[in-house]
Amino acid sequence: MTSILRKYGFKRKSKQRFNEKVYTKKDYDESYAPTKKVLGWVAIRMTHSISENATKWWDRFYWFEMFNLFLTGPSEMVSMVSTAYEAKTFLDSIKVFRMMPCFGCVVLSMFKSINMVIHRPVFENLTNELRAMWPQGEVSEEEHEIISGALKQLNIIVKGYYWCNNALLISFLSPPYFLTLARYFGHDSPMGLHFLYWLPFDPYQPVYYEITLVIQTWHACVVIYFNVAWDMLFCLFLCHITTQFDLLARRVRRLFYVTVDQQLVRSYPMALVSEEMLRVEGERVRSQGDNYWQTRHHAEITQIVLRHHALIRLTGDVEQMFSLALLINFMNSSIIICFCGFCCVLIEEWNEVAYKSFLVTALTQTWLLCWYGQKLIDSSKRLADALYDCGWYNASKKARSAVLIMLHRAQKGIYVTTHGFSVISLASYSTIIKTAWSYFTLLLNFFKDKSANL
């Protein structure tokens, strides 16, 4: 069983690192491995090392997938409209509520996948630039804690989110197959499909039913993995950007040496940093003249400013590539959470889990995006705090001016928005949940009123 999971899931590292504080580009590449695997399943190229001939087949298969989804979306829309039009009572129209979350996911997956394909050079540039920033060789204990902590969080979150969506697929797609097996063994079980497509033929006829069921299963897998791949990329980029912000903040805190005296107590963080510099670099830290420190500070501040500008620019690329999809995603999430909750409460039996798993996955996906958005905000604030606490008052006038300019920019904060409407943060998650709850209670009260009049 373990070997099967490793073959078709995500492989564990076969060897333990000999020196945990030594990092290479391979560690960075391994953080992208799960996402690249999911992208490969839906034929979306993203820094994949494949031949030119394979690239053509990948592109053809992707557009074949998109052609299917372009047919699926209108088919579901027509089915929902016809179901609502033909319904004689409110209870007959409840089928529409079951179809709404699925239709929303189809539209969202199409938008996300096209965005990844059309703007693939921008996504690859983000990957390559963050790779160039990745630390190589042995790092300090504090840097190791920053990097290893970020990678562990990313590993747990990415794998957890991946298997959460797989659980959704299994719970949502398996019931019709169980019913088919039951009929095969002689039981009187109804025929059911995953989704209610409008089709020009009767899909419940022999042979047609089996073919339609398999095609709908494939459509569901494509939709889910389109969404999963996009969400993973967003989390990956923000994870590495926030890691670089934290490493930059650590570097800023060690920019200036401040003598520990009666004014600077040894227990203060700045004093601890100065003592560490003294321990690492020796007594020459105290004996160097002003010219040495001016030259050193100029070189280090120049590198810090360039890195800060690069991170701001990369965050802007993330904003440009993801913001519109995030806006659609969050609007869609409120509706999906509302209708999934409605289906869980009033339509599904207690032992049915399809829409319950759908609800859990929708809540998890929204929280994941908001949590990494909050991490970006917090890491940019930590850089501003580091600039203020770095002992700049003990430096030359030129260095103080440079730090003041950086501090002024860092205090503005770095964040990603939903196309300018709201900032992606945990506060946004709270707003989405409140909105979904308002829709849910309104729909529930409307249903109770209609049921009472029957």
Regions found by a protein language model. Name each.
Residues N125-P135, L247-R254, A299-D317, R382-D389:
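Short amphipathic alpha-helical coupling elements at transmembrane boundaries
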Residues R251, L346-V353, L359-A452:
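C-terminal transmembrane module of eukaryotic multi-pass membrane proteins
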Residues R279-H308:
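Intrinsically disordered, low-complexity acidic Ser/Thr-rich regulatory segments
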Residues K95, P101-M116, A167:
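Transmembrane alpha-helix/interfacial motif
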Residues S109-R131, C235, T242, T366-C390:
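Inner-leaflet juxtamembrane helices
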Residues S113-V117, W134-E138, R254-V260, D290-H298, ...:
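Short intracellular "coupling" helices and adjacent cytoplasmic loop segments at the cytosolic face
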Residues T2-M99, A132-F237, T243, R253-L278, ...:
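Helix-loop-helix junctions within predominantly alpha-helical proteins
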